[in-house]
């Protein structure tokens, strides 16, 4: 697993091995069948919290993560990501398609003030 926040990696609820502190998958060279990401999707004017702030339209930071992860997805592999109705999730899906990934919504869950959306993007 990767995270940009070293403290988060060291304080997981469910401990695991092979953790890397990096942006997206910039430090990784291997390919994976499945990549799962809880994107920082909230639309914000400035990035104050790397865990939640996605920049303009909630797209700016996720785009960088997509660009980083794309090289690590095997042909036929899947990229599952969580996004929100508070962001421009269609813009994310369109960008995935621009990269050559076919995308579709797998699930939606209404919460108090937003709807969480799980998207599958397949290479």
Spans of features found by a protein language model:
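Conserved SAM/SAH cofactor-binding pocket of Class I
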Residues: 1-37, 43-44
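Active-site-adjacent beta-strand anchor residues
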Residues: 2, 55, 82
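Short amphipathic alpha-helical segments
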Residues: 13-14, 47-50, 92-94
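Short, well-ordered secondary-structure micro-motifs
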Residues: 30-32, 47, 92, 116
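Short, hinge-like loop/turn segments at secondary-structure boundaries
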Residues: 36-38, 97-98
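Mobile active-site "lid"/loop adjacent to the S-adenosyl-L-methionine
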Residues: 39-64
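Conserved Class I SAM-dependent methyltransferase catalytic core
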Residues: 61-120
């Amino acid at each position: 697993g990767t995270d940009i926040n070293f403290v988060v990696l060291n304080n997981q609820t469910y401990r695991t091995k092979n953790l890397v502190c990096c942006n997206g998958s910039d430090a990784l060279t291997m390919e994976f069948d499945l990549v799962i990401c809880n994107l920082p999707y909230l639309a914000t004017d400035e990035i104050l919290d790397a865990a939640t702030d996605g920049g303009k339209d909630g797209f700016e930071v996720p785009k960088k993560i997509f660009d980083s992860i794309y090289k690590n997805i095997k042909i036929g592999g899947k990229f599952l990501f969580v996004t929100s109705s508070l962001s421009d999730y269609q813009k994310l899906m369109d960008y995935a398609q621009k990269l050559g990934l076919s995308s579709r919504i797998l699930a939606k869950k209404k919460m108090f003030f937003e709807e969480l959306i799980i998207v599958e993007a397949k290479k």
